[in-house]
């Protein structure tokens, strides 16, 4: 049992070390070669994660295989913090994604979205001008609206209104249903005389670099995407936490065995 727990911990940490190499390499590569704010946004978290996994796995590997109790203690402490952070993140993710859903529009195949329907924490993220400028840049360089424009370019207005658009397409690539603009094609609409009850109608522009990227509906569409993504991540994180707890338990056995051998 003594040898088994140490060997198992060594094997698990060897694979974790191998995993850290491509994560760290990808983060460094993104930092040097990123073409957009979207890509640059990911480089630092990936570098930090890669370095953390590398050092923790080395500590666990050496501590288990060479029976160095102080390294195993540091490893277990880091693992405990990781489990605690993962647990807190999972609770937080479920808490901030428990609100928000698209509004069903009569005679429309798509929904429309409103920032006020989502949690206050998420609202603050998109209402921050600096944050939104970076996100807006990401959306412009992505294929969200270009794919939407290509896919629906040849359909008439009746078929367009029946289209099942996703949250970003509905919020960022077309004007709000409240505007009652005249349809020309998916990204070209003729404005009707104001005033408008929805401020997004004033923001809309047919220019490909503008569209509705600064609309509240676009922010809400992004929040709906984040909400759905975070719920999926939180569910996966539960499985990951179970795995970490198992590894932590094996580490505790190895640490206890090392202490017994030293006595």
UniProtKB/Swiss-Prot annotation:
Keywords: Glycoprotein, Membrane, Transmembrane, Transmembrane helix. It is a multi-pass membrane protein. GO terms for biological process: auxin-activated signaling pathway. This is Tetraspanin-7. The chain crosses the membrane at residues 8-28, 46-66, 76-96, 235-255. Belongs to the tetraspanin (TM4SF) family. GO terms for cellular component: membrane; plasmodesma. May be involved in the regulation of cell differentiation. Residues 1-7, 67-75, 256-263 are cytoplasmic. InterPro entries: TET_plant, Tetraspanin/Peripherin, Tetraspanin_CS. PANTHER family: TETRASPANIN-8-RELATED (PTHR32191). It is found in: Membrane. Residues 29-45, 97-234 are extracellular. Glycans are attached at residue 180.
């Amino acid at each position: 049992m003594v040898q088994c727990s140490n060997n198992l911990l060594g094997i698990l940490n060897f694979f974790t070390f191998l995993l850290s190499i491509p994560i760290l390499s990808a983060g460094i590569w993104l930092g040097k070669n990123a073409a957009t704010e979207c890509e640059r946004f990911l480089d630092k978290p990936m570098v930090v994660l890669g370095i953390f996994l590398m050092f923790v796995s080395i500590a666990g590997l050496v501590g288990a295989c060479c029976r160095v109790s102080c390294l195993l203690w540091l490893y277990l402490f880091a693992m405990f913090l990781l489990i605690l952070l993962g647990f807190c993140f999972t609770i937080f993710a479920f808490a901030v994604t428990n609100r928000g859903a698209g509004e069903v529009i009569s005679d429309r195949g798509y929904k429309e979205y409103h920032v006020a329907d989502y949690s206050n924490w998420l609202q603050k993220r998109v209402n921050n001008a600096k944050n939104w400028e970076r996100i807006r840049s990401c959306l412009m360089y992505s294929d969200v609206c270009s794919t939407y424009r290509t896919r629906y370019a040849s359909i008439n207005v009746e078929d367009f209104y029946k289209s099942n658009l996703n949250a970003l397409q509905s919020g960022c690539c077309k004007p709000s249903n409240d505007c009652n603009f005249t349809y020309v094609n998916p990204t070209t609409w003729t404005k009707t005389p104001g005033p408008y009850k929805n401020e997004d109608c004033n923001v809309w522009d047919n220019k490909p670099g503008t569209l509705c990227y600064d609309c509240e509906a676009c922010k809400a569409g992004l929040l709906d995407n984040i909400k759905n993504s975070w719920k999926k991540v939180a569910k996966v994180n539960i499985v990951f936490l179970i795995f970490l707890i198992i590894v932590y338990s094996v580490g505790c056995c190895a640490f206890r065995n090392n202490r017994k051998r030293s006595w």
